[in-house]
Structures are given as C-alpha cells and as structure tokens.
C-alpha cells in the first residue's frame, strides 16, 4: 500500500484473493496443506466474478443468429485468458533476461517484499473484463459492433496521441505532488527495480482514473459507430505491450528503429527512458510517448546516454563466480521456478520426497495440469538454463536448472541421457569462467557421477572446483541434533552414501554412539571411520532391539516409511541428512526437522524465489557450501571421497554471515 493510503486504495475483491498461494510459512504440514487449498479457493472466488457474465455472453452468442451475435461480449473471456498468458510470458522473458543479460538497466536487488506487493497484477485484467461486460450491457449499440472497422483504428490512434497522452502526463505530474504521492502513487514507486507487472500495480482509485483515460478512445469509437472487436482489443494489447516494455528492466529496443525513423524518439519510449522515472522520480512522466516530456522540459538529460549504455551492455557481466546446478523435481515444479509464477516461486513448495510427489491438493493438481504441456516441450531441451542470478558482496551467483525430473534420474533407462545433460552443464559452467560449481539434489548422485568425481577424473585440469557440499551439510545436521544427545539411530542406503559416512564419522569423533540397523550401511560407514572411533559405531541386528526403540534421535536418509516412524518412541526427533524430505509425516507426537539448510546473510541480494520446499531466504546447505568455498578461496574440489572438513566448513559459513536454520514442530 501507499505510505498513507487514501480512500478507495483497496481493490473491491481484495479479501477474496487472486491466483496466489500464501506467503506464510507453516511448521505444521497439515496446516500448510489447508492454507494452499484455501488460497486456491480464493482464486476461484475472485475469478468467479466474471463467470455469470461469461456464461451469459456465451449463451447469447450460441443462441443468436449470425447477424445478431454480440461479438464484443463474447470476446471478453478469451481476451482475458490471452492477456493473463501474455502477461506471464513477459514475466518469464524479463526474469530470464535479467538473470543472464548484460543489458539489465537497474542492477539493484529485487526482494520478496516487492513480489508480495505485486501479487495482484491480474486485478487490472479482471477489472477490464468486468467493465467491458458492464458497458456492453448498458450501451445497446456496443452489442452490435463488427469484427473490424478501419475507421476506429484512426480514431483510437488520434485520441491516444492527443487527449490520452496529454491528460496522463499532467495527471502523472499531479500524482507526484506530495499529497497524492503519499496516498496513492508511492505504492507504484515502491518498486525501484521494475518488472513488467510493476506497470499495473496501483491502488484501486488510481487505476480507475487510468481506466477513465483509456476509455476515451474506446467510448468515442462506440459513440461514433466506428468501434470493432479487433480495434478495441488491439488497443488493450498496445497498452499491455507498452506498459510491460517500459518496466521490463532490460533494454531491447534496437537503435535501428530510431536511425530509420528519428521522430520515433518522441512517439515511443524505451525501457531505459522509463527506468529513469523510477530512479529519479522527477522526470520522464510521459505515458508511452516522450513527446510531452520534451515539450514541457521534464525529459531527463541522461535518457539518451543510459539508452546507449544499456544497449551496449555491461562488460564482464557474463562470468559467474559460483554456479549451482539443480534440476526439476516434478512437472509442477517448473511453474515454481523464478521464471514461472512469481508468487508461487516466492512461497515454499509442498515437500516432495525423492520417491514420490508431495502434496496432492487441488491447487497442486491444477498446477500439474498446466505444467504438463510445458514439461513435454522442455523434454526436448538438452541444455541447462539459467533460472536465477544473485549477489553476495562481490560474488556473482547463478542457479542453473537441468530440464529433467526426479523420476528421470531414478530411471535406469533415462539415467544415461540425464548424465549427458548434466555433464554438458558442467562443461558450460567451466566455459563460462565459474570458479565453483555446486551439485544440487540428484545431480551428485553416486550412480550418476560418484558425487561429482567423474568430471574431475575425466578432466583433471578442470579449473572450476566441483563442490558436493557434504561437509557443510553434515555440519548443519549436527547443529539440529538436540544438545545432550549421546546416541543416534542412523538409517539410509549403503550405496555410495558419502553423507552418511561423513556424518557418522563426525558423531563418533564426538563420542556419540551411532546405531545402524542396515548391515550394508554399517559396513560402508565403518570403512570411513578412523579405527580408534569404531567403538562408537554399533550394528543393531534387529529393528525391535531395545536400542532402536529407545533412541530419541533418528538420522534419516531419502526414505522414511510410515512403518519405520511408528517404531520410534514418542518425542523422537527425525533429522534428515538428505537433500530431499524423507517422506510423509505420520506421527503427531514426534519432531520432524528440516533438510540441512542455512539462512543466507543479510547482504545476500536479489533473492526473491524459494529453493524448493525451503522458506524464504533459506538455502540448502549443499548450495551454500559452494558460496562459502568461493568466499574462502579454497583451491580444491569437494567431490568423490574428498572432504573439506565439517568443522572447517561450519566455521567459515558462520564467519561469512550464514546462520543455522532448523524448522521443526510437533505435528
């Protein structure tokens, strides 16, 4: 909201909500699931406002004869859906460009607060549909407009260049008067780093005034009998395009356009021109045409220079210091990336175990239905793509996503193909000049690349350091174990479980008894211990032994079945040491801890998307390990059998501002 919200600042349906998930982070998974379902219901309620009009217009269109159909009303619903899709495409393209492009204009941090403030970007599309339906019902002549009338195109163009642009310019200057600015326009200007949807983030009263201006050409066309469905909706498309262009925060308007037609400089603004309005505030007030800024002397003198610099791009911006290589978990996770739905990316995803999907709520099912066609197209892609770019002090950090899903990593048939994509991503990271590469989720699976060691074996001279993050992840697990614990139960698989070995070794060094039920895991872990610590590692022959029943701390791997959970005594702590949540929660009297993670330093910039199921500004320990590696300047790999050192990694992480994180609660 504005700093001092004025009358009619709230949108009428604000309490119903829009297509958004909650930003609240619940510790109780059952409450999290109910909250997500509630937000999905809110989405349905807000868009249900359009439903009666849409049903009525469709019914009338079908029942009417070919010469009596109300084309304008019938087109409202498909145009609404197309505008939603078009807006989302702009969000995706803009975020992709600002993560990788040298042509980014404002190089400042975008945070979760801005994402929350701009969650209602679809309100203006919903309002447009409602107003179109209302005017169509109130003005009979609007019910008989044709598909096309070229005269309306001329009317719309002249009225936009004249009254609309002129009135908007002076209205905009008035909104920068301290009285109106504090009550209305400051809400829009709270976003210094703009995104395409920033263009439509205004209080309701301010948006109504803008709609009144944009209605001048539309109502004039209706009144003069020159209106048509194509021109009316084409005018909306023009407004959307110019709005999103001006706020996309990367320069894409080619110089050739202005060289071929120099007057275009006064008829079309550029992203860099409007960005100055958001950084300087007292210049570049024009809507889409800088003509009036030049006429009244408010054009920023640095506009041309900024345009040239943004078009040329920043030298050296392409080389990241640290690349984190992750992958998709499910098709729906595609929409939860930073490049997907902004509000979903800013909220933790439902926990998904390695061996199955997470939530089965109606909202998750709907997301999966939307994502499946996109997932099918993405299956043809054989290159990892940039999803996120962050900064910490002087480090440039990037997150790359392998376009493959957890199920494909677990499939013997698909593992070879996945391996080729991951290996190419590793080669691309080195070619980009990255100093450190971290392997997230199953990108470091033993059966895929032996915790990254395969790439070092194939290229011993590799300059980029491969970091699997085992040391820091083990340290994070140790921090979650309650103080005073003298024994733990270690569960997991034996197959290449480096994490279990490092963790057990650290526990035995601290003289904590480690009980292992699985014989193969016991033998695997024992080989990684110093002989003098073997006495602290015990093999339990049976699940129902006294030690298994009474141990209060369970260290669990990728899978924790309901049957296993029921064997624990009340009050037991389940502490995952895997990158994936181990499974569904079935005990109400036990404590379930987070997967190993750290809270990022306050200086960490441009973080506005959650990492999978972790909450805001929390990062998996494996990802954080690479950043610490680069900050410390360590010139060694941590992959395969190589280990940085648990205590060494933990001390370094804390020294650089990372903080322990442990989300847990009794269910």
Each model region followed by its residue ranges:
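Non-catalytic, topology-defining segments of multipass membrane proteins
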Residues: 1-186, 190-224, 286-289, 293-391, ...
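Histidine-centered catalytic micro-motifs
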Residues: 167-194, 199, 239, 243-252, ...
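Hydrophobic transmembrane alpha-helices
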Residues: 201-268, 290-293
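Extended, charged/polar low-complexity intrinsically disordered regions
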Residues: 354-422, 426, 430, 436-437, ...
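Adenosine-phosphate binding glycine-rich loop
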Residues: 382-385, 389, 393-396, 403, ...
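Phosphate/diphosphate ligand-binding glycine-rich loop within oxidoreductases
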Residues: 419-473
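Glycine-rich phosphate/diphosphate-binding loop of Rossmann-like nucleotide-binding domains
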Residues: 482-552
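Rossmann-like NAD(P)-binding element
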Residues: 516, 537-581
């Amino acid at each position: 909201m504005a700093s001092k919200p004025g009358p009619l600042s709230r949108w009428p349906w604000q309490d119903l909500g829009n297509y958004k998930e909650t930003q609240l982070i619940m510790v109780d998974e059952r409450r999290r699931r109910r909250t997500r379902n509630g937000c999905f219901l809110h989405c349905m309620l807000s868009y249900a406002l359009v439903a009666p009009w849409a049903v009525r217009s469709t019914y009338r269109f079908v029942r009417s004869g070919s010469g009596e159909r109300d084309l304008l009303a019938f087109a409202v619903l498909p145009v609404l859906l197309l505008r939603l899709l078009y807006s989302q495409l702009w969000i995706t393209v803009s975020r992709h460009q600002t993560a990788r492009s040298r042509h980014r204009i404002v190089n400042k941090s975008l945070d979760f607060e801005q994402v929350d403030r701009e969650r209602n970007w679809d309100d203006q599309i919903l309002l447009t549909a409602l107003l179109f339906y209302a005017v169509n019902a109130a003005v009979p002549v609007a019910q008989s407009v044709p598909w096309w009338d070229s005269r309306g195109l001329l009317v719309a163009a002249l009225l936009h260049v004249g009254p609309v642009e002129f009135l908007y310019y002076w209205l905009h200057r008035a909104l920068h008067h301290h009285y109106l600015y504090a009550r209305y326009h400051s809400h829009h200007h709270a976003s210094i780093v703009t995104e395409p949807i920033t263009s439509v983030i205004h209080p309701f009263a301010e948006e109504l005034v803008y709609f009144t201006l944009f209605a001048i050409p539309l109502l004039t066309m209706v009144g003069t009998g020159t209106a048509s469905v194509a021109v009316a909706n084409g005018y909306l498309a023009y407004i959307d395009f110019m709005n999103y262009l001006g706020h996309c925060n990367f320069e894409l308007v080619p110089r050739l356009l202005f060289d071929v037609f120099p007057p275009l400089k006064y008829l079309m603004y550029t992203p860099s021109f409007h960005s100055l309005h958001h950084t300087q505030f007292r210049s570049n007030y024009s809507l889409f045409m800088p003509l009036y800024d030049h006429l009244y002397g408010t054009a920023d003198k640095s506009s041309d220079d900024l345009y040239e610099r943004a078009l040329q791009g920043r030298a050296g911006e392409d080389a990241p210091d640290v690349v984190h290589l992750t992958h998709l978990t499910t098709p729906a996770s595609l929409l939860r990336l930073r490049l997907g739905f902004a509000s979903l990316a800013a909220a933790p995803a439902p926990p998904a175990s390695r061996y199955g999907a997470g939530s089965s709520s109606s909202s998750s099912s709907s997301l999966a239905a939307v994502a499946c066609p996109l997932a099918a197209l993405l299956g043809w892609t054989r290159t990892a793509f940039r999803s996120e770019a962050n900064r910490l002090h002087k480090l440039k950090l990037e997150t790359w996503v392998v376009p493959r899903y957890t199920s494909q990593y677990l499939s013997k048939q698909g593992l070879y193909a996945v391996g080729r994509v991951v290996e190419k991503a590793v080669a691309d990271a080195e070619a980009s000049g990255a100093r450190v590469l971290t392997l997230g989720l199953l990108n470091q699976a033993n059966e895929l690349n032996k915790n990254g060691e395969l790439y070092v074996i194939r290229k011993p001279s590799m300059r980029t350091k491969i970091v699997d993050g085992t040391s820091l992840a083990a340290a994070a697990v140790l921090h979650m174990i309650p103080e005073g614990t003298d024994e733990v139960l270690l569960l997991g698989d034996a197959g290449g479980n480096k994490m279990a070995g490092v963790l057990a070794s650290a526990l035995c060094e601290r003289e904590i008894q480690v009980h292992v039920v699985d014989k193969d895991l016991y033998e695997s872990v024992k080989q990684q211990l110093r002989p003098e610590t073997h006495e602290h590692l015990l093999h339990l022959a049976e699940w129902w032994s006294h030690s298994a029943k009474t141990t209060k701390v369970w260290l669990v791997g990728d899978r924790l079945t309901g049957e296993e959970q029921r064997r624990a005594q009340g009050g037991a702590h389940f502490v995952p040491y895997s990158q994936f949540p181990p499974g569904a929660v079935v005990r109400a009297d036990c404590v379930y801890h987070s997967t190993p993670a750290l809270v990022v330093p306050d200086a960490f910039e441009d973080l506005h998307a959650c990492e999978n199921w972790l909450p805001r500004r929390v990062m998996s320990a494996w990802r954080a390990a690479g950043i610490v590696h680069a900050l410390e300047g360590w010139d060694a790999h941590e992959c395969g059998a190589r280990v940085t050192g648990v205590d060494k990694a933990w001390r370094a992480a804390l020294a650089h501002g990372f903080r322990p994180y442990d989300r847990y609660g009794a269910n």
